[in-house]
Amino acid sequence: MLTNEQIQSCLKREQKALKHCYESCAPYLYAIIRSYIYDEENRKDVLQEVFAAIFSSLSSFDINKGPFKPWIARVTVNQCITYLRNQRKLNLFVPLDIESYTGIESEDKILNQFSRQDMLKYLQRMPEGYRTVFVMSVIDEYSHKEIAKTLEISVGTSRSQLSRAMSWIKKHLTVELNITKNG
């Protein structure tokens, strides 16, 4: 990632340092964006917004409080959520009685059945609302309370969306694995 000296150079708005920051961090941040945003062109737009946010708020980054990588990851996730909110795509969240999902297997049991590559492949096909909560919960390890606050939904809706996402994954990956085995 970046050294403390390079971060200090970015704070001074040195063009060479800003360019290096972009070139070294863009692939990592783009991978995060891919988890949230389906459309390629929109991903590129969000990546630009992420760097604008990083560069404009770089002065708030405190080297003594923690590493740079998690800080820029958090900025990226926040920008993705802001983008989705602005696109009104988060209206896909439908409140659901969580009790109706008590028969679903645990997250770990479902996730351990499939490779990471399979998961990433199907993540892009998952409905937006499910995918957002799934990524925040499983990949970014947000609590349901944090997800609810960030997305402005209830904790129950967060749980139900994750349950629906897990069911969706299980259904689609199981079908794919059966086709692969029998095909």
Language model feature labels by segment:
Residues 11-12, 51-65, 87:
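Sigma70-family region 2
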Residues 60, 74-94:
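Arg/Lys-rich amphipathic alpha helix in sigma70-family domain 2
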Residues 82, 90-116:
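Internal acidic/polar
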Residues 1-27, 171, 183:
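N-terminal module of bacterial RNA polymerase sigma factors
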Residues 133-137:
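A short pre-motif secondary-structure segment
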Residues 6-9, 91, 149-152, 166-183:
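C-terminal edge and immediately downstream basic/flexible tail or linker adjoining helix-turn-helix-like DNA-binding
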Residues 11-20, 30-49, 155, 178-179:
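Short, charged helix-capping/linker segments at alpha-helix termini
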Residues 22-41, 57, 73, 123, ...:
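Amphipathic, Lys/Arg- and hydrophobic-enriched alpha-helical face
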